[in-house]
Amino acid sequence: MSEEMQYEYLVPLEKYLSAGVRLGTRLSNKYLEDRGFIFAVRPDGLRIFDIKKIDERLKIAARFIARYPPDRVLVHTTRPYGFKPVQMFCKYVGCKALTGRFIPGTLTNPNLPHYQEADLLFVVDPKLDAQAVAEAAKMGVPVIALVDTDTPHQYIDFMIPCNNKGRKSLALIFWILARQVLRERGELKPDQDLPVPPEEFETRLVQT
């Protein structure tokens, strides 16, 4: 039996594929290429992530997050499709959610009313969330980030390569992480799921 057949994914491979988790952009970051995160390039130029590496990084990230007191972990996104996944993740894991604009000084100026203390920052897109990443670096706060093929890697301590733009991808990623963090803490059994499916983490499109 091949190593690929023996590897146990956190969710069935088909779930990753249907959610578009492995789909990158047409731009490529050599830093990610050199680390083997980018598996292939489609004829249309779209970069494809290695799903096994995504899965492996999710397992490591969950162990890392589980080491911190939940109220010392700040999860931030300015990407609208990330609002619901981040809020649901924080609901189940107990972390602090910060969605929308990141006000300068949030991590660096304790005199501001919106000041937040954190021992770990988790961002959805380091390009859009650059202010938060820069402030975390200044304060010595480690940063976990979802990174697409076009994402800069500066100041990121741990990268999770994935499609960090799609609704379904973000929902599945945060659902997996929430479940895995709770398993790492012993709050869920190793074979136990969250009480809601990944679809409940998904941002709903509003019909106009």
Curated annotation (Swiss-Prot):
GO cellular component: small ribosomal subunit
Keyword Iron among UniProt keywords: no
Record-level GO BP terms: translation
Region (Disordered): 189-208
Keyword line: Ribonucleoprotein, Ribosomal protein
Pfam families with a match to the protein in the record: Ribosomal_S2 (PF00318)
One MF annotation (Gene Ontology) recorded for this entry: structural constituent of ribosome
Family designation: Belongs to the universal ribosomal protein uS2 family.
Protein name: Small ribosomal subunit protein uS2
Name of encoding gene: rps2
